[in-house]
Design a protein with these regions (language model features):
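Core segments of cupin and vicinal oxygen chelate
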Residues: 13-54, 60
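Vicinal oxygen chelate
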Residues: 1-3, 45-46, 92-131
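Short beta-strand/turn micro-motifs at beta-sheet edges
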Residues: 62-68
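Short amphipathic alpha-helices within nucleic acid-binding modules
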Residues: 86-91
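A generic structural micro-feature
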Residues: 2, 39, 69-72
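Exposed loop/turn and edge beta-strand positions of beta-sandwich/beta-sheet ligand-binding modules
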Residues: 6, 41-43, 74, 113
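N-terminal beta-strand motif that seeds the catalytic metal site of vicinal oxygen chelate
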Residues: 1-21, 33, 75-80
């Protein structure tokens, strides 16, 4: 591993693995079939984004991840680099057409003028789409 540690995966808790999985597949992820862990009873799905995996874990029967039980802060946003302004525009349009909320339509932001859009996934997690 050169250059230090690399992010291997990020886990998101959800009440709807199937709905959240469909949203991230629309962003280009390759999804495993959702399955249920025999030991914990938690339903989960792994989404592959090239070198980083996004694990979706469905909360069932009042189960809460340890981070929530401890009152720890959560995720601020997930960021996805799409490669072009046209890709940001197209995906933002597709996300809106699918009924998901667009917080900020595509625009140039910040002093560097980075082209981005900010949307919400079905669970309300903030997702930033950039070039």
């Amino acid at each position: 591993m050169s250059g230090g540690p690399q992010i291997e995966h990020i886990a998101l808790a959800t009440n709807d693995v199937d709905g959240l999985c469909a949203f991230y597949v629309q962003l280009g992820a390759v999804a495993s079939e959702p399955s249920t862990d025999r030991d914990t009873g938690l339903r989960h799905c792994a989404l592959d984004f090239c070198s980083v995996r996004l694990d979706l874990i469905e909360l069932q029967g009042g189960c809460e991840p340890v981070e929530r039980q401890q009152g720890l802060p959560g995720l601020v946003h997930l960021g996805f680099a799409l490669g072009s302004a046209d890709a940001v525009d197209g995906l933002c349009e597709a996300i809106a057409a699918a009924g998901h909320r667009v917080l900020e339509p595509p625009h140039r932001a910040g002093e560097l003028g980075r082209y981005e859009s900010i949307v919400l996934d079905p669970d309300g997690n903030v997702v930033k789409l950039t070039v």
